[in-house]
Amino acid sequence: MDFGSLSGDAGGTTTTVVFVMALLVAFLVLAAQYESWTSPVAAVMGLPVALLGAMLGCYVMGTPVSIYTQIGIILLVALSAKNGILIVEFARDFRAQGNSIRDAHSRPDISPATYSDDIACIRIRGYAAAFCNRSRGGKPYCTGSRRSVRYGTEYLACHGLYS
């Protein structure tokens, strides 16, 4: 990747630190919210895929790593964790109805993969709305003054959400 700033030597390590700190803060906030150490694991499982897509998108587009890209990483962690939270909440509601975890996988009418797909399909509307709002909401950010500096945030967020 091309480091487009004067602090290019420190940019690679800073990006790694920002990613690790954002992931750690997201996990700890979710652990406090769910009062459990296992539920947040399910909520943050999609983060590596989103970050891989974001970094690949930035590499393909030739976006330099800057402070705006690092802000985009933090935004992406938050948006991807939100999608995981919605799926975990749906599963918790299923358990609150008196069903066990095994009930979801032992139902004769659906397979475990279908159940997971059902959860994702039900929640896809909210995820698609978040993607569209993030994509369209960033347009003024990318078309205003100094847009050449800030486009990295939008590329990173859109590519990460798309993956």
Curated annotation (Swiss-Prot):
One of its GO terms (cellular component) is plasma membrane. One of its GO terms (molecular function) is xenobiotic transmembrane transporter activity. It holds the Pfam family ACR_tran. This is Uncharacterized 17.3 kDa protein in cblS 5'region. To E.coli EnvD. The lineage of its organism: Bacteria, Pseudomonadati, Bacteroidota, Bacteroidia, Bacteroidales. It comes from the Bacteria. InterPro entries: Acrflvin-R (IPR001036).
